[in-house]
Structures are given as C-alpha cells and as structure tokens.
C-alpha cells in the first residue's frame, strides 16, 4: 500500500515525461531562452521528482554553479515526487505562456511552437499559440512528406517522447558530472545548453559567470564560461599554493642560514667568582661574633 501511495498518478507521470522531453529537445539557438531562475526551478523539480529530497552535501565555495543548483534542490525540502512532477508541469505551462507572449510572431516563433506540440496531446490546459501557427507547422510537415521540402521551409524535428524511466531504479548521484546538468538527466534547456549553446544573449558560445538568479537571465555579452571559470579558479588556487610554497621555502632557508658575526648576540657574561683574600674572608665570618662579644663587654662594664 505504501508503494502505491508514493507512486505518482499515471497521467501526472506521463505529462511530466512529455514536459521533460520538450525541455530536452528545445533548439540550441531558438528564439526563446529560459531565464536563470527558470532553469534552476526546472532542475530542482526534476531532481526532486526523480531522486527525492536532496541528501547530497553542499558543494564547496569553489563550485558556485553547483551551489546554486544544490540550494535550489535543497529548498524543496520534503516535497513528494508527485508534487514535484506537478510543479514541473506547472512551470512548463508558465514557460509556454511566456513563449506565446514574448516570442516574435514570425517563422522562428512558428518553429518554437512546434516543439510544444507533444504537450498539447497530454496536457489539456497547456497554453496554445494561435491556430494559424499550428496550421502552418502542420502544412510544413505535409509538404515535407509529399517531397516538396525544397519549395517550403523545412519544419523543425519534433521531439520524441522518451520511454518513462523507472523512478525507483535510479541510483542517487553525489554530484553532477557536468557544469550545469547531469550526464544522463539532461533536462533544462539552459542547465544543459548554457555550456553548449553559449550565453543567454544567444550570440556567444560562452556562458555568463555566476550571478544572482534574478540578473543572470538578462545579462548579455561575452563573459567567462563555466569551463573557463573553473579553469581560472583552479589556476588561481594553484598559483596561490605555489606562492605559499615559495614563501615557506624562503623562510626555511632563512632560518637555516647562519647569522653573520656582526649580528650574532654577544656571549652571555658568566658571573665571576668572588675573589677575597684570606684575612678578609675570616673577617666576614667572625665579625658577627666579635660584635656580639663587644656588646656583652659593654653591658658588663655598665653594670
């Protein structure tokens, strides 16, 4: 009974797998690129839905991207897998609506809408573009099938829905092998595509350096990519280590070098023994007795 309660509903899992398939197959240079916050939300919901609560340790300070991902996943706490799948689907709906509202209504937009078509079959309330765009995409497919691909624009390859993986059979992973995506669980368009597609501006093949999530999705321009940033950090740390070793070596060499004679401290003066003559020494030994004898003589005479 416990397993049945924990397993997600079939419809929810089917919708989740369709949404993951769409995210995986978004074009590398498409007209829409999710923001940094959206990428982190997709990543955290996917990890929660497939692996459960975050149990891996927090990455070190030298892995800022890994820390962002860990914090996003860890923030979900004890959210159930079904709730995470539902949240992933809800986020997918918001992204689809954002595409409809923001992407220019041109041929590129028609391309983009085609990638969401598998979701319309499994998610009834999925936001849809105007029917004219869907008809144009359908017309492209028919022309391609009829052999008129040269006379009409070639439609984009629609993503194929992968076979749903067994959630219980997935072993836990300590840390992602890639900078922003798992080597097997390629889910987010930018968590996968950031290191492959370039910055969010869409014109460079490098990714912005880690910035706060609210600003990351809006930055443009060639900044350090994740691999370049990692290489730079590793090089900096190694340079610091080399500098520390050099300083330690110099200190050890200075400590082992003999000091010049002019800087050597003078030898400590040893106390000289008290040299007294024999009569003087006898006087020092007998003077208390002499004083005592004289004092007694004085008292006797006084009486």
From Swiss-Prot:
Residues 204-219 have a biased composition (Basic and acidic residues). Residues 153-165 have a biased composition (Pro residues). Residues 12-101 form the ACB domain. Keywords: Lipid-binding, Phosphoprotein. GO terms for molecular function: fatty-acyl-CoA binding. One of its GO terms (cellular component) is cytoplasm. The keyword Metal-binding does not apply. Signal peptide: none annotated. GO terms for biological process: fatty acid metabolic process. An acyl-CoA binds at residues 23-32, 43-47, 69, 88. Residues 148-178, 191-224 are annotated as: Disordered. Binds medium- and long-chain acyl-CoA esters and may function as an intracellular carrier of acyl-CoA esters. This is Acyl-CoA-binding domain-containing protein 4. It comes from Bos taurus (Bovine). The gene is ACBD4.
């Amino acid at each position: 009974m416990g397993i049945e309660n924990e397993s997600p509903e079939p419809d929810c899992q089917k919708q989740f797998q369709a949404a993951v398939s769409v995210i995986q197959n978004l074009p590398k240079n498409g007209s829409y690129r999710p923001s940094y916050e959206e990428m982190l939300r997709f990543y955290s919901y996917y990890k929660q839905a497939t692996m459960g609560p975050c149990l891996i340790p927090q990455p070190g300070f030298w892995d800022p991207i890994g820390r962002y991902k860990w914090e996003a996943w860890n923030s979900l706490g004890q959210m159930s897998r079904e709730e995470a799948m539902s949240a992933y689907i809800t986020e997918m709906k918001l992204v689809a609506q954002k595409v409809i509202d923001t992407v220019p209504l041109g041929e590129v937009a028609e391309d983009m809408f085609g990638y969401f078509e598998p979701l319309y079959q499994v998610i009834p309330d999925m936001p849809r573009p105007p029917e004219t765009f869907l008809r144009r995409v359908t017309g492209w497919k028919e022309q391609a099938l009829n052999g008129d691909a040269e006379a009409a624009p070639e439609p984009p390859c629609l993503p194929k829905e992968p076979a749903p993986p067994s959630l219980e059979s997935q072993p836990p992973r300590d840390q992602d092998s890639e900078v922003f995506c798992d080597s097997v669980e390629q889910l987010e368009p930018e968590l996968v595509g950031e290191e492959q597609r370039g910055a969010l501006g869409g014109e460079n093949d490098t990714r912005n350096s880690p910035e706060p999530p609210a600003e990351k999705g809006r930055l443009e321009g060639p900044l350090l990519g994740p691999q370049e940033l990692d290489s730079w950090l590793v090089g900096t740390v190694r340079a610091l280590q080399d500098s520390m070793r050099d300083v330690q070596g110099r200190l050890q060499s200075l400590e082992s070098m003999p000091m010049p004679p002019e800087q050597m401290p003078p030898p400590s003066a040893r106390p000289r023994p008290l040299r007294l003559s024999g009569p003087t020494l006898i006087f020092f030994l007998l003077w208390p007795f002499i004083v005592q004898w004289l004092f007694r003589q004085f008292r006797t005479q006084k009486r």
